[in-house]
Amino acid sequence: MAMLWLIYEGILQYSAPQLQLLPHLLLQQSVTTTPLANMAVGGQGAFGVVDYQSLNIIERPQSGSVQIEGTTDSDVNAGLRWGVKQKEYGALFAANYLKQQGDANFLNGSDADRKKTDILFKVNATSLLGARSPQQTEFTYQFIDDDSYRSLLGITAADWQQDSLQLYSATAQDNHQGRQHKYQLSHQVDLGDSRVISDFYYQSYSQQLDQLGAFNGQNIGLGTLYDIAAFDRNPSVNGDDINMLVQDNDYSAFGAQTQAINQYGEHQITYSARYHTDKAEMRFGDQTALWQADRSIVRDESNSVLAYTDDATALTSAIDSLWRWQGMQIKLGLTYEHVSVNREISLVFAGLDEADFSDSDWMPQFGVLYDAGDWRFSTDIRRAWAAASAGNLTQEAQESLHYQVSAQYASEGIKADLRAYVQEFDNLHVDCDSYSMCVDTRLLTQENIPDVLSYGIELGLGYQWMLGEFELPLGLSYQYLSAEYQTSTCTDIQGCVLEGDKLAWLPEHQLQLSAGIEYAQYQLNLVAAYQSERDFSQYGSELQRVDGQWRADIAANYDIDKYHRLYVRVENLLDESLVTSASNSGIRVENGRISYLGYQWRF
């Protein structure tokens, strides 16, 4: 139930995890979600991760593709991938450029533009002459540049009912600029019954972020939101004062990790170790501006308000073992992590405190799996732990016990998966995020919620139906989640809650249906997703509830031949007004219906 941490190529951030960019879909090889825990990446990953892997070098002398698509909103996306593999050497170059205009509506005629450039380069070499064991060394470089409209301000409920895609022109200059570089050297050696994988990495990220922070000297709340809406509808002759929160942040990380996978007959033992250090230099400023009668914005010079540097160093070691006897498998694991955290203040601000502490703990795991042919049954118990961040005044770690039982069935095109789990949190970390618009010291802090109980059920069904020359893949996924506070508590970020209250924002029920048809060179796929009503009574919000929502997407492909493909995709087919967040800073929604037409050439 805790937030899933994002990792890319096994790299997990500690300081300022929000300072990162994810690669475009066309440059991803796979995305793997581990909702329960991934101990190998340390304490943060012990609460689940979403792991992005970049494109692999294809084992072919030459391969590649060119793809271009446009949308009904005049968006353009173009991508290129080219790879070679000659004897012991291989290389890959991939790039993608995205330009989006968006379908948001500003009364001053502005656009919610986005431009994003991705570049990926890889080169590898397999065993050279004289090598005693098969091995491979690979170097990866990745570059991502993002320039986009990014605002946390929503709209009032009345404006949402009238035009859900409206944006207030006070945010027309809310902008994000980010640039990320990543270098990674990986080495793998096969020693017969064992395999050793090692990685060395360095990454840097620079961010400039301007966002509306105050209106007429007051922080954004429900009252000021209505005032902003009123001015946008009927601007005053003299205009109104606004303040921009200006950020100039830099992040860097370096680390090394290794994993040794040893096979002893049917049994397997994996040893892993990791060293990671990162630093986030955060600089905040205030910039006054005049929102004029023509809805344009004239900005003054910005003034520095606060500045601090967070750095963290983590040492992680783990041992995982898998013991097999006939149809029985027993999994035993133990992880240890030591984290040192420091915060230095270079420009003092009220509510911002320095920090210098370290923490460590053990994370054991026990699991049993029984394979009965078509059926598989398993149970898993583990303890999860994550050190506090520099903004946690009490320096309390996040701790929980996870329990899970599951059953899987697979036979003749039918797949079924049923899981039930319980998570007992002794302490749960909360940060200022999409629940509310934070432009004060809440941005700098991490708070603690004691005693949270979460439990749920997940059901997945899949069937591959063959009807003559037609292939019809069908799927169903259902999730039930309940998360409750076990103790009454108050925090600055979420406000006050009572024992038995539900955690805000989490839907109890989620359902996804998928259906497709494949015939010769034609493919058609439909996906429909449902989320039950969600509650917003916490995080200082007076917006109590958002009703259940449906979203449907459809995609169709036509393969002209083995080299050329045409495709059409329609997202939000029903053109629903889908709420992504709601608080005293307003309601924000996804884009409306948008259609894509694309072409792909493979060679």
Residue ranges and their predicted role:
Residues 83, 89, 124-128, 142, ...:
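Conserved C-terminal beta-signal and adjacent last beta-strands/turns
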Residues 251, 264-278, 287, 291, ...:
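Structural signature of Gram-negative outer-membrane beta-barrels, strongest in the C-terminal barrel
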